[in-house]
């Protein structure tokens, strides 16, 4: 070990790591002058959006009726600026131009400006949706003492705030950035919602950890999920090269007032009708008619144990 030359090892390692064959699909060739997506900037965008949507619960400043307009204005202006930069970075990632000063880049800048302004203009609508989610979470959990507790503590509201912002960006065909925003919530809360999913009003997830909602899911109003639920794809067709065909509908549709209990798995492009109930640990891969219930059959093994003097426990 003492004969190893650090300089030689580093030189050889860098050479191997820089070989083109090892970088296929793993290296993004960035042109000078193009912005790069920034996780830190996106985290600030999420923080600002939470402070705007739930003033007084999030943010660095105290808010009252006299100062609320000022604080929302400052945060919205900052958010729009950061959004412009990050949307532009996403657009450049998805549509690489040859030079940063070419006509295409100028067009992408205009597009990013429009998208960032549109997203900020949608914040009242997003707040209205999230208000219904807060109400659903509160009404669905007897352990919750107040809306304040729901907004401040419950992971579902954090995850849905990220999702509802990311979904609007996804609908405006912004590359990369929507997924980065929802994956931040995934890391923070354990709730994995693809930004392409369509989710209606009054949606809630109790506890939340381990929930997966796929890209082509459609979820109606007043739907409630519990922890560990998967709304996933059963299978997907492959092209002639054996690769998955992208963009096809492959995840479930949950109509209004559906309840799915913990660790249930619902797979494929099936429809779960209105007011259905799916029990815990149940697998569902077929349509369910409205107002039907599906539970996993439990095998009951009765064991008679006599505990004499604690039996050593």
What is each model feature region?
Residues 1-180, 309-313:
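Terminal amphipathic alpha-helical/low-complexity segments used for targeting or macromolecular assembly
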Residues 185-302, 306-307:
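Structural signal for interior beta-strand "rungs" in well-ordered beta-sheet cores
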């Amino acid at each position: 070990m003492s004969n190893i030359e650090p300089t030689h090892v580093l030189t050889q390692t860098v050479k191997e790591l820089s070989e083109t064959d090892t970088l296929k699909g793993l290296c993004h060739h960035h042109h000078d002058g193009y912005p790069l997506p920034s996780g830190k900037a996106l985290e600030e965008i999420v923080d600002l959006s939470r402070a705007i949507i739930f003033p007084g619960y999030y943010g660095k400043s105290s808010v009252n009726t006299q100062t609320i307009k000022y604080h929302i204005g400052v945060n919205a202006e900052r958010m729009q600026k950061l959004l412009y930069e990050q949307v532009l970075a996403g657009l450049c990632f998805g549509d690489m131009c040859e030079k940063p000063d070419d006509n295409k880049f100028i067009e992408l800048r205009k597009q990013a400006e429009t998208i960032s302004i549109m997203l900020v203009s949608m914040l009242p609508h997003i707040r209205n949706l999230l208000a219904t989610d807060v109400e659903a979470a509160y009404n669905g959990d007897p352990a919750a003492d107040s809306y304040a507790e729901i907004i401040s503590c419950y992971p579902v509201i954090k995850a849905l705030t990220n999702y509802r912002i990311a979904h609007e960006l996804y609908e405006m065909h912004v590359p990369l950035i929507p997924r980065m925003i929802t994956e931040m919530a995934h890391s923070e809360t354990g709730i994995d919602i693809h930004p392409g999913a369509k989710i209606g009003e009054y949606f809630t997830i109790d506890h939340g950890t381990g929930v997966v909602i796929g890209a082509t899911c459609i979820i109606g109003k007043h739907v409630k999920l519990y922890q560990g639920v998967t709304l996933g794809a059963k299978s997907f067709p492959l092209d002639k090269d054996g690769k998955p065909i992208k963009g096809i509908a492959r995840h479930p549709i949950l109509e209004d007032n559906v309840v799915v209990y913990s660790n249930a798995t619902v797979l494929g492009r099936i429809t779960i009708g209105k007011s259905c109930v799916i029990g815990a640990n149940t697998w569902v891969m077929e349509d369910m008619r409205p107002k039907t219930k599906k539970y996993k059959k439990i095998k009951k093994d009765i064991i008679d144990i006599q505990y004499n003097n604690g039996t050593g426990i």
